[in-house]
């Protein structure tokens, strides 16, 4: 019987869809399992990274269903974003039309893969029924003081006269017109994620099922540090600059202070000084550099003297105040004290600008000479030139000096975070409108919840230049003030797409609710997500924002959990020729081409077999062909044994021949391995490998055992369990094979089989016999022999007796159940 994957896959996809085979409802009598892959941006076509992500999730979903769980496995679309707007500018296609056309195509491709989604729960973030509730989320944060507006620097293209997202700035120039991009200070909306910094950090401990690397990335991004803020008075002005440092033990070694060029006080400090012009030129230069270009360790340190000096409150030293590229206003206070003797960055800057270097920490038993130093000393040592703290170990001096600073009123202890508030404003059209109306009398007024959604207008001119595209809509701009009724102006910014994706996992639980974003009882049943799957590139922003929003909703009483994802799997990339697939490299493999040539089951099997899920996967055409051949082998042997399966009775192990026992052992050993590999480790590659070994054993049994000696009951057991074990990996072929052996219903509705522990205890085992570490024989012995009895059998083997004749046996080393090594001279 020919394996006609084209007809088979179409047949079962149609049947699953018509019968809503994977639709699910809350059922308190069953244990729930929520498996979720990160939803895609609808770019137009699936790529192999998508196939890998969704195939992994589908194995988990199907396996859990077969283990009796009530499985929620939904899919949707992260549908707002810049590409749709660029399509409108370049091709004259409205973002809405472009997006929905792409969604239709990608949905079709997903169905081609046979992923077991509950399509009744499909969501798209660009649909008003969805972004109504994104706007509702904004209002909850706004009402509770967690959404606010302030001025912030944004990327600005002077040629396009528009704000650019970071993604639109490539090597410092606008990707559209290639003009040099600068910075502009504009009013922007923020979410106050910094209020949750410590909780987000502390609760990383709860994330037992997350990869360590992701947890470390989040810890570093939040970036908690303990230090002290100290005020350095500006000489000749009634003003001070506030320094934040985690190294107060070095404060007596400050020889200059650095302030960020964009710090709000800089303009006042330089005004009227001889350095004003050169400082302004430097400030303008810094505006055209991004954070990475300024702060990377390999970037040359640059700065200019402000013409001002500041006073170190601890020793009265008058030190110069510099602007420098490596200090950012967003971090700490935007001002740092420079101790070149004990900080490498400061050391390099001091050498470049011929600034003093003052040693205040000496290594034990040595004496540093500042004039001869070639690098900063950053290890633990003992304080010198530090007044009353001389002789104190530097790590012990930190706390003592902070106490002294507080006692003297020079400053105070401070915990700082690298994490900044979440800037959500986008001067874009294709995003969720921010539900705020500006009234000349009432100020910024939130749109009432009953008036949501604020719908995106359609009368938009997409030029790619000027202000937000929403400003071109005459129907959108004007709106009555919800407080006083006078005509006001709508907010023209839209929300960052990360806002939409920070709560979508909640909407899946209740996607058709038009009264609320979700029903609390349904959320209580399904949440948290048991298994989340996606790329490590989302380790920080998306996952951190989702955790933040969940904690806000928890604090407001809308949910009962404050962490959204119990377990996280970050799958590796799909590579070809050692590089990530990309059009520019010409190494892209189209999923549709593979499906057309080999079928979806082959594509899935290869992507799951070629590598553990968390590792990168190297594409191999030969590997794909090998997986196709394996499915054909399974297809042939199941169909050859189909009649025997239908005739097979109940298993009676007491009648087993030696060949029967070997096949029975292989079946149960495979069941154990596959179950453990899927449920405990997600090692799908080794699970598939185990099934391949079972298929080899089945072929051996078919070829070596005469037809009239074959145990039909055993064959039936092996074939049935083989099909069930393969079902999560190759769902279409196994449905067809299940039907071919005369079974009713779907294979995916079958109970996952358990193994028989007794079957894993062999009556006989094979022992490798070595002489001086080299294999010389293999013997079969009863499994219940003692160590001494096995060694005796090994020494009495005819081959071993011949090899050791005339030699002195020095000792015998045994590894129970595996080998005997005889050492001779």
Curated annotation (Swiss-Prot):
It comes from the Bacteria. Keywords: Aminoacyl-tRNA synthetase, ATP-binding, Cytoplasm, Ligase, Nucleotide-binding, Protein biosynthesis. It is found in: Cytoplasm. A motif ('KMSKS' region) lies at residues 580-584. One of its GO terms (molecular function) is aminoacyl-tRNA deacylase activity. It holds the Pfam family Anticodon_1. Its main location: cytoplasm. Gene3D superfamilies: 3.10.20.590, HUPs, Isoleucyl-tRNA Synthetase, Domain 1. The keyword Cell inner membrane does not apply. Its EC number is 6.1.1.4. GO terms for biological process: leucyl-tRNA aminoacylation. A motif ('HIGH' region) lies at residues 40-50. PROSITE patterns: AA_TRNA_LIGASE_I. GO terms for cellular component: cytosol. The keyword RNA-binding does not apply. It catalyses: tRNA(Leu) + L-leucine + ATP = L-leucyl-tRNA(Leu) + AMP + diphosphate. ATP binds at residue 583. NCBIfam families: leuS_bact. Belongs to the class-I aminoacyl-tRNA synthetase family. This is Leucine--tRNA ligase. It comes from Acetivibrio thermocellus (strain ATCC 27405 / DSM 1237 / JCM 9322 / NBRC 103400 / NCIMB 10682 / NRRL B-4536 / VPI 7372). The lineage of its organism: Bacteria, Bacillati, Bacillota, Clostridia, Eubacteriales. The gene is leuS.
């Amino acid at each position: 019987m020919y394996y006609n994957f084209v007809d088979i896959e179409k047949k079962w996809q149609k049947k699953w869809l018509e019968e809503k085979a994977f639709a699910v409802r809350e059922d308190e009598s069953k244990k729930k399992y929520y498996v979720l892959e990160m939803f895609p941006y609808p770019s137009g076509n699936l790529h192999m990274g998508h196939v890998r992500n969704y195939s992994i999730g589908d194995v988990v979903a199907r396996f859990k269903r077969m283990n009796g769980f009530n499985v929620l496995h939904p899919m949707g679309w992260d549908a707002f974003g810049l590409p749709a707007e660029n399509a409108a500018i370049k091709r004259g296609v409205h973002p809405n039309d472009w997006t929905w056309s792409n969604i239709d195509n990608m949905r079709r491709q997903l169905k081609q893969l046979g992923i077991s989604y509950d399509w009744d729960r499909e969501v798209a973030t660009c649909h008003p029924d969805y972004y109504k509730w994104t706007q509702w989320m904004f209002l909850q944060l706004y009402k509770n003081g967690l959404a606010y507006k302030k001025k912030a620097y944004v990327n600005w293209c002077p040629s396009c006269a528009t704000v650019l997202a970071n993604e639109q700035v490539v090597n410092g120039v606008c990707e559209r017109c290639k003009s040099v991009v600068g910075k502009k200070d504009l009013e922007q909306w923020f979410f106050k994620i910094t209020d949750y910094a410590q909780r987000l950090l502390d609760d990383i401990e709860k994330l037992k099922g997350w990869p360590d690397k992701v947890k470390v990335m989040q810890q570093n991004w939040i970036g908690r540090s303990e230090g002290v803020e100290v005020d350095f008075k500006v000489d000749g002005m009634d003003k001070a600059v506030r320094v934040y440092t985690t190294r107060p033990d070095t404060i007596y070694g400050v020889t200059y202070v650095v302030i960020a060029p964009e710090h709000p006080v800089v303009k006042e400090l330089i005004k009227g000084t001889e350095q004003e012009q050169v400082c302004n030129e430097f400030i303008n230069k810094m505006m055209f550099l991004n954070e990475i270009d300024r702060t990377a360790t390999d970037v040359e340190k640059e700065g200019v003297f402000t013409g001002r000096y500041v006073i170190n409150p601890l020793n009265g030293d008058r030190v110069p105040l510099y602007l420098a590229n490596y200090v950012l206003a967003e971090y700490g206070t935007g001002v740092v004290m420079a101790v070149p003797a004990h900080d490498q960055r400061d050391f390099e800057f001091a050498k470049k600008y011929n600034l003093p270097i003052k040693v205040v920490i000496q290594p034990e038993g040595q004496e540093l000479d500042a004039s001869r130093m070639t690098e900063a000393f950053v290890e633990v040592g003992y304080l010198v030139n530090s007044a009353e703290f001389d002789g104190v170990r530097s790590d012990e001096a930190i706390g003592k000096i902070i106490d002294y600073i507080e006692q003297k009123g020079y400053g105070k202890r401070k915990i700082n975070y690298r994490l900044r508030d979440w800037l959500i404003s986008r001067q874009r059209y294709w995003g969720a409108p921010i539900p705020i109306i500006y009234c000349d009398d009432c100020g910024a007024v939130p749109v009432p919840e009953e008036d949501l959604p604020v719908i995106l207008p359609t009368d938009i001119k997409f030029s790619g230049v000027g202000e937000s595209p929403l400003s071109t809509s005459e129907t959108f701009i004007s709106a009555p003030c919800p407080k006083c009724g006078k005509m006001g102006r709508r907010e023209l910014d839209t929300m960052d797409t990360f806002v939409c994706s920070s709560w979508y996992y909640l909407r899946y639980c209740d996607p058709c609710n038009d009264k609320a974003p979700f029903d609390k009882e349904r959320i209580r049943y399904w949440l948290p997500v048991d298994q989340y799957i996606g790329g490590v590139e989302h380790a920080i922003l998306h996952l951190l924002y989702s955790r933040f929003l969940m904690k806000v909703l928890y604090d407001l009483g809308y949910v009962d959990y404050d962490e959204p994802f119990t377990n996280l799997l970050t799958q590796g990339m799909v590579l070809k020729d050692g590089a990530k697939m990309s059009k520019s490299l010409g190494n892209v493999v189209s999923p549709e081409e593979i499906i057309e040539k080999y079928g979806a089951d082959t594509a899935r099997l290869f992507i799951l077999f070629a590598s553990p899920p968390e590792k990168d996967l190297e594409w191999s055409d030969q590997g794909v062909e090998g997986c196709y051949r394996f499915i054909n082998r399974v297809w042939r042997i199941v169909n050859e044994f189909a009649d025997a399966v239908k005739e097979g009775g109940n298993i009676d192990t007491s009648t087993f021949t030696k060949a029967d026992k070997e096949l029975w052992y292989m079946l149960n050993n495979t069941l154990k391995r596959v179950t453990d590999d899927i449920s405990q480790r997600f090692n799908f590659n080794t699970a598939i490998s185990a099934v391949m070994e079972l298929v080899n054993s089945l072929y051996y049994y078919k070829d070596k055992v005469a037809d009239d000696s074959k145990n039909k009951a055993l064959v039936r057991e092996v074939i049935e369990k083989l099909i069930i074990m393969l079902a999560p990996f190759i769902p279409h072929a196994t449905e067809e094979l299940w039907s071919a052996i005369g079974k009713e219903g779907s294979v995916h509705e079958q109970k996952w089989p358990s193994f028989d522990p007794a079957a894993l205890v062999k009556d006989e085992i094979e022992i490798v016999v070595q002489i001086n570490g080299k294999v010389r024989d293999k013997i079969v012995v009863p499994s219940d022999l003692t160590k001494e009895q096995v060694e005796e059998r090994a020494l009495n083997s005819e081959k071993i007796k011949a090899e050791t004749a005339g030699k002195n046996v020095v000792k015998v080393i045994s590894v129970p159940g595996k080998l005997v090594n005889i050492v001779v001279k």
